[in-house]
Amino acid sequence: MSGEERMEAYEEKLRSKPTIPTTRISGSGKVHIEGIGEVRVAGAGFVSPEEIDISGSGSLPGGIRVKKVKCSGSISVEGDIEAEDMDFAGSADVEGHVKAGTLSTAGSFSAHGKVKANVMKSAGSSRVSSGIDADDTLRAAGTLRVLGDVKAKNLVDLRGAFQVDGEIVADRFEARLSRHESHVRGGIRARDVDVRRKESEGLVIFGIPILRRFFREGRLYTTSIIAEEKVYLENVSCDNVQGRDVTIGQGCNVRRKVTYSESISVHPTSTLAAPPEKLASVRSGK
């Protein structure tokens, strides 16, 4: 069964919402939800038709659909989960799809299905097996691993190291590279693209940076970067770059073509396989 078929089956299942008894747990305990399974808690928890709040460790059955989920500590979800507001702090592992209005994760987060949210904010380490679809914004700081595509109607903002097996499609794409390599194997398409290296001061003594050259800088590897308007790149290795106003900053390597429609700037430390070509107009194809 494909990822889309699993998501359709999941949404069909959620149309019949189960009854969740209101229960407060202190120490350890469990709550049985008819037709779904059991909520297990070791620590403290509150379970109701509107909200699930767990501190400590616990597990949720697949098919949970409430307004708010908040988990601090270690949590596992044995299938799909949906909430308007979802907040995981610590370690969270979801065996299925995640559907949320706002999804916030801090620590270690893993989803074995697809993540669909209005806004997703991730701090720490996140892994998503079937892609991320954000109606508005995706912000990730730390490490992000996505086995599918990443799509956002507004902004994708990545800070740290990221690995995306598919493509990134957004209105705006921004990245600040850490000292580690990042990869986007399917390319990047957006209205504006801005990729910059993280400033490394090296070892600072009495306010003076020394040994800067011994600290490794991050690099982004991808195929094509296509923007409708502005492109600014640092420490990027790619096949093609296309945009209206294109700035190839320091440390870049473009293996095939750079095309632009209005302005072009190339830093002397960057290498191009061929001189930039001017086009009548460019489109991202989003």
Regions found by a protein language model. Give the residues of each.
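Intrinsically disordered, low-complexity terminal regions
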Residues: 1-286
